[in-house]
């Protein structure tokens, strides 16, 4: 078993970061995620948003890894459960693979919270537990997978910034459009009065 942990601070408020987290895929930084399906989404009586999603991924595994695990197929599926608490301002996301579970399990947990000293920033705490089962060189593969998770976490942070930039651009565009539509009737009314 290998445990990987990381902490990152986003220079954006919690509301922005959690909105981006829900819209993170697809993105050009991590093309291995090829599909996201929402299986269930509901708000519980206390106001928490619960989501259950299925992520489809396509991994380009090195040939040595394919030969060790005895699989040519690289499409895998991950189930993801998240809970967003808008009152406490926390988002907890847990994911686990549902493919190749007889050989490997990757259990990941992410927590997004406002930064305690600066509410305009958000802290992401991330942990992954990797267990390779019944395969020779198991600890080597766990280390390799931890390295891949670390690399993908960096890509994930870049993707979050990309989504946040995209969301901000959409907001600016909508704001400009709304301003234009307000000015047009006012200008027309001013023209009619003359």
UniProtKB/Swiss-Prot annotation:
GO terms for cellular component: mitochondrial intermembrane space. One of its GO terms (biological process) is phospholipid transport. The modification Phosphoserine is found at residues 46, 51. This is PRELI domain containing protein 3B. Disulfide bonds: none annotated. GO terms for molecular function: phosphatidic acid transfer activity. It comes from Bos taurus (Bovine). It comes from the Eukaryota. InterPro entries: PRELI/MSF1_dom, Slowmo/Ups.
